[in-house]
């Protein structure tokens, strides 16, 4: 850049608009996210040598690589991922997919990523902090194309009544469907959810697939203090944690295929405890799956014996912000399917579909009234909900007990797959800057600095940025912002540097000019910007 002899200090920053996820509160509770897979999926451990390069934790360096010949896609399992400061970890597949981890959402979690297409995945750390590290433990793969890979989940709420006849019939449906996973939407064993009731009513029927079941509690389960019977049955007598989560909380999450499922507890007080909301937001922030479902007992909206419960709106607020897809509930003893809605119960194309399936076996409650979003309902058929899930959407079927004829069928596309990711703006200050002069001297008092003593020398201001925090994102625009504190005349051109340099060794002759990026005329003090052209995007 040629500068006039007037004094012109300029400081530089780089602003880039990128596609990425907005930051949410980090997860603090250590937990392992269970991954259940499709029938056509295989799993292999990652050898210590390839995962860790012979060290306990992988640090910055060359990319690790996980490969499986013939695979259509892979999921990478992390035993540990800890990111400090602005460090990031980038996964890039041979099929062209990319997944970027940044922030502290995954600290103290072990988890499995969403699928990445291709036979190989490169894991590249961009670490500058000593505390950042990662450790792999396994990977899943399939020779079946991703759009053909499906998994089945089934369940219901309000299940085993005192007679047991109806829940025997709905449990037979689950056995016939043969799902990968089963959910319950609460009130699993009547009347009070005691361990005796679970053992005598639930265990002989729905207990046949207990090993596949991820439950949630209802108000009848809490008729026994602390839902002791519920937790003793699913976790084991006296065990604090287990398949039903920590008995002091009753909420947890798990993954199946390319779906993230969240089991929530609507019985944590008259209103949902803030601790559960904070946990939910952190859990959703750490989720890498393209599709999300949540299930709990009380509905936001109902047209049966109840009209809905405002206490669950904080759940909906968090789920809607995270682009969740399905909410599965019970409490009203009937079947109701709603169109996609926002937390204010208004129709929304990016909303969540609520399916109320309180048809597991308890005596029916009648449907009462209507709602613009109520798409299907029935109050006389015991049955279960069957969900066939893919990486982009779902198919739902209400399956009736033998001898009944009512059915329902619906489909949907996952919100994250049907919309654009949010735009994030990053501002990166220059990490190196120095002015070099054609006479051989240098000055780094500012990015560009000229005064009357330069004697007609030609000056070049060198600037560099660390853009690792933008790794893996899609760049939609970028500009260099210059802060002018003393205006000058003339036009100053911005080029790519033609050689590597440091502030200590930079020289006018040692750094040639590359492609021209743009120009600025600093004729006024304050901010001046140069939009990057194609020459400035290859970074």
From Swiss-Prot:
InterPro entries: Calcineurin-like_PHP_ApaH, Metallo-depent_PP-like, PPA-like. It comes from the Bacteria. Residues 1-29 form the signal peptide. The keyword Ubl conjugation does not apply. GO terms for molecular function: acid phosphatase activity; alkaline phosphatase activity. Keywords: Hydrolase, Secreted, Signal. The C-terminal Pro-sequence may be required for translocation of the phosphatase across the outer membrane. This is Alkaline phosphatase. It comes from Lysobacter enzymogenes. The gene is phoA.
